[in-house]
């Protein structure tokens, strides 16, 4: 599940902080490990955060990175399979289409790493502590899939 879902978990933690609990369901697939998982991240407030990761789709599906964030005054939509890839849909008014650099999350992540080890100045995206917390969250998600229960962090 780490390779499958760590990027989703990193993003959730980066945007919303450390959850108090997780509740996950998953499917063991052809890899012999979790090949599809859905997690609800539980916070003390009223946030509703769900992330899904999987690689058992039919080959014709392709690969998609996406998110939907529903806010009080707008909805933010991103999908690597759609054009435009990123839209801001305000409650009132016309949709806004911010510029998004060409590429995908993986290529940007690799370039960031290469720049970092090459000694180029790079912006810190997450701290080592946040990286460790992402692994803690993933381990809690795995336990939740096994026990079919919420797991506290």
Place the predicted regions along the sequence by residue.
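Conserved beta-strand positions that form and line the central face of beta-propeller blades
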Residues: 21, 97, 152
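Active-site loop of classical SDR/Rossmann-like NAD(P)-dependent oxidoreductases
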Residues: 99-111, 126
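A generic "alpha-helical surface" signal
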Residues: 2-3, 10, 104, 129-132
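Contiguous beta-strand/loop segments that form the cofactor/metal-binding neighborhood of enzyme cores
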Residues: 3-83, 110-121
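Short amphipathic beta-strand/extended segments with alternating polar/hydrophobic composition
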Residues: 50-53, 76-80, 89, 94-103
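Short acidic, glycine-rich loop/turn motifs
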Residues: 41-45, 88-93
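Alpha-helical packing segments of well-folded alpha/beta enzyme cores
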Residues: 8, 109, 134-138
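C-terminal helix-rich "cap/oligomerization" subdomain common to oxidoreductases
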Residues: 42-44, 114-153
């Amino acid at each position: 599940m780490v390779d499958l879902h760590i990027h989703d978990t990193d993003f959730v933690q980066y945007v919303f902080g450390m959850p108090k609990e997780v509740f996950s369901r998953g499917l063991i697939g052809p890899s012999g490990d979790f090949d599809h998982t859905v997690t609800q991240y539980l916070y003390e407030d009223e946030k509703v955060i769900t992330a899904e990761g999987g690689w058992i789709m039919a080959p014709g599906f392709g690969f998609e990175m996406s998110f939907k964030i529903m806010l009080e005054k707008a909805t933010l939509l991103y999908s690597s399979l759609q054009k435009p890839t990123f839209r801001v849909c305000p409650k009132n008014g016309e949709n806004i289409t911010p510029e998004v650099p060409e590429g995908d999350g993986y290529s940007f992540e690799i370039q960031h790493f290469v720049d970092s080890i090459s000694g180029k100045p790079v912006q810190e995206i997450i701290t080592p502590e946040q990286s460790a917390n992402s692994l803690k969250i993933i381990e809690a998600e795995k336990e939740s899939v096994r026990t079919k229960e919420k797991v506290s962090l």
